[in-house]
Amino acid sequence: MAQPPIRIAIAGALGRMGRQMVEAVQADPRLALAARFHRPDSVGDGLVSRDEALAMADVVIDFTTPAASADLARVSANRGGPALVIGSTGFDAAELADIADAAKTVPIVRSGSFSLGLNMLVGLVEQAARAFAPEDWDAEIFEAHHRHKIDAPSGTALMLGQAVAGGRGAELDAVARRVRDGVTGARPPGEIGFAVVRGGSIVGEHSVSFCAEGELVTLSHAAGDRIMFARGAIAAALWVSGRPPGEYDMRDVLGFDR
């Protein structure tokens, strides 16, 4: 007997990724678009309130803002569901703590990128960081996005930074250099640098360079269309539906070894 489609609600349904997700869900026979919601004052014309959407869905896919995502996680946990797929970026420590607390009650997949290729890049970067001694190999992360992106470095760039730091057995916050300006002095060993570009309609470009005396290794990924993020979010929604509570990421969804 065929399984019934998983009921999906889309948060931020009028945003760029929200509109992309609506189209992708409607095109997938494994899913049913149960509800769309946006801001509290955006109801009607096919949009419902957040509370109505949560009651109608098995999984909510959320590409909104850090504050909205953290609040959504709290509300979902308080009512015992539904599961969440969160693609928002730019969270502060308190918002991340709220999501982690909610994940004790409901299953949540949160990722800075839902691209399969990008998540493969994260794994390769971590392997390279383990192999390249920080005393000899400097790590630099570059990212570029469209002019409308409001956080920097991007969530994906921070994922890559975490991969470098994790491969080296370090804490990213202790070794990250997010800004360089003026007379900065010589680069300390083990530092992880970030460079950011914002302009035009760039969907997303990321690279990690390991620089040693006489050689340079660069691993990179470029996004040409937001549909790849939608495909990854759908894979996450299919995977997380029916899972036990916990905070998961795309490595769990894709079955990558830790």
UniProtKB/Swiss-Prot annotation:
GO cellular-component term (any): cytosol
Active site positions: 145 (proton donor/acceptor), 149 (proton donor)
CDD domains: DHDPR_N (cd02274)
Molecular function GO terms recorded: 4-hydroxy-tetrahydrodipicolinate reductase; NAD binding; NADP binding; oxidoreductase activity, acting on CH or CH2 groups, NAD or NADP as acceptor
Cell location: Cytoplasm
NCBIfam families: dapB
Record-given protein name: 4-hydroxy-tetrahydrodipicolinate reductase 2
Source species: Mesorhizobium japonicum (strain LMG 29417 / CECT 9101 / MAFF 303099) (Mesorhizobium loti (strain MAFF 303099))
